[in-house]
Structures are given as structure tokens and as C-alpha cells.
Amino acid sequence: YFYTASSGIENFPSYVSFGLVDDVQISYCDSRTNENIPKQDWMDELSSEHPTYWMEETETCRDKQQILKGNLEIAKKRFSQTEGVHVFQQMYGCEWDEETGEVKGYDQFGYDGEDLITLDSNTQQWVTPRTQTVNTANRWNNDRTIKEHEEKFYLTQTCVEWLKKYVNY
């Protein structure tokens, strides 16, 4: 999944998100529509099996929109940038090797086109090349809730369960 919050760009949504499976777009949401919509016909089959799927995805879109817009404002302050065009992004998801069964989760954030903070999938530690986000990485590394839910449970279990459903269509 890709999430983007931006500021200072006229005639462009301040938030855009979309999901991909095997490099094929499956969903799209932005701050203008505030609704997550399917981008593949086979997603309708998924809806019949999981009737609340799109309602839940829309809720996630709206929640992530608020979170990313907040993160964008925090980043602008940390980098002492209040005006101009700025972009805050998150890319997260999972990979599953059907042959070996190997699972790999990833979660990374960027600001203005540069890496900001990334989950190292080997060490399960947050790392950052930027001094402005060292405190955030340290705080996340010491937060049991983030470590247990986000890193272990979601990225290596829930995400993979959904990925397996998607690739079956």
C-alpha cells in the first residue's frame, strides 16, 4: 500500500492512497472522494465474500488520511519548513513466496522524496538516516504495542492472509 499526504500543490488531492498486488493497482482513495474504490473487476467477488470490505477500506483511508496529514505537519516542523510543496509518504505491505512460503513485511516512510524512517525486516528495528527522526525511531523501537501488532502480527500474518486471498482471484 502507498499513502501520500502533500501540501502546497494546487489542483491535486492533499491525500492519495492505493493498493497494489503484483504491481497491479487494486484500490484507490483520495481526499476529494474520501472513499476507497476497487480498481479491478475481480475485487467485486471479494466484496461478495466479505460484505464489509469496502466500508472498512474506506474507514482505513479516512483514518490514514488524518494520520499522514498530521505526520506531514510534524515533518515540516522538524525540518523547519513551513511553506512550499512538501510530501510525506508511507509504503507498507508484505511479500509472500508461494514456493518457499517465506514471508517478508515492510514499512517505510519518506519525506520530500528522501527516506525518513524504515523498518529493518531482518532486525525488526526502526532505522533512520535522518537526525530529525532518531528520537521517533528510538521511541518506536521501545514501544511494545507497535512491535507486537504492527511489525509482527500485521506485516507477517494479517497482510499475508489478505495477499493470499487477492492472488487467488
Task: Label each PLM-derived region with a short phrase.
Residues 1-169:
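Extracellular/lumenal regions of secretory-pathway proteins
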